[in-house]
Amino acid sequence: MPSLVDPVANKTDEGNNRTDLKAPEPEHCPGTESEEAGKADACQGCPNQDICASAPKGPDPDLPLIKDRMKGVKHKILVLSGKGGVGKSTFSSLLGWGFASDLDREVGLMDIDICGPSLPKMMGSEGEQIHTSLSGWSPIYVSDNLGMMSVGFMLPNQDDAIIWRGAKKNGLIKQFLKDVDWGNLDYLVVDTPPGTSDEHLSVTQYLKESGVDGAVVITTPQEVALLDVRKELDFCRKSGIKIIGLVENMSGFVCPNCKGESFIFAPTTGGGKALAEEFNIPFLGSVPLDPRIGKSCDHGESFVEEYPDSPATTAILDVIRQIREAVGDPQEDEDDDMDE
């Protein structure tokens, strides 16, 4: 089983010398081999500044390995949110289950929310351990065509806190990309932490050469959530990440008895649809609140399969249909299949 003690060796570009540091890297360390090492704002006052500034620099030797590993992945999709608590990881799990409901598609789910890994619980794979082979780390498979990877599988105890600075998080993300034997995938869904942190910068940097299809941004209707989504959209544009679209999650509650709809989070400024129009990005739809989504996540079940008649399932499947069209993999119409 891979160890959490030292996710990635801190080597120079020759690959055989470790950069000896006087003190642990600061939280926003750009990396000791980065072009910004010793020069970035986070380096000011760091005891390692002189060491990093004088260390040999060069192209990251792992980038070609990542590019080679990602050759077998057709579509890479980031799931982002500006604020925590809007259902980003929940929606990542729904995307994983939804893409995998097409048995002709191979799907991977990568959890880079290093300090808050919740996907193992949501996917019903808590307690599983990562196995290694000559091909690399083996993903944990929750169905025949849906594999996943998370730091949650590497914890000795599920309640253990992960207290890592940026450089160590970045090292693990790099290993998820270059060491995991993803095989040939149609979709790799990447669940990220909220905000714009080291994890976001790392995954966009590491996947730059192999290409990212784009980002799906999750929000809730209220302005407090939209404030942070605006920053997330700005991050995408500055980083050169295409925005596939915006999803408004928990947009309303449909009573299962009277079918009336109540808006739990009032869209005081127009909600996600108005924001999408403001930024001229696609609005993928509104997903109503259904308490059974939480129940399915707690039990590690596929909500869309367990509750196919839910209005939330209809909305989720429509979002998936639009994402597939956006990346050039439109769903085949079931009626057409029957005619054939």
Swiss-Prot record:
Spans annotated as Disordered: 1-41
UniProt record, GO biological process: iron-sulfur cluster assembly
PROSITE patterns: MRP (PS01215)
InterPro entries: Mrp-like_CS, Mrp/NBP35_ATP-bd, NUBP1/Nbp35, P-loop_NTPase, YlxH/NBP35
PANTHER family tied to this protein: CYTOSOLIC FE-S CLUSTER ASSEMBLY FACTOR NUBP1, NUCLEOTIDE-BINDING PROTEIN NBP35 YEAST -RELATED
Family: Belongs to the Mrp/NBP35 ATP-binding proteins family. NUBP1/NBP35 subfamily.
Protein name (Swiss-Prot/TrEMBL): Cytosolic Fe-S cluster assembly factor NBP35
Annotated organism of origin: Yarrowia lipolytica (strain CLIB 122 / E 150)
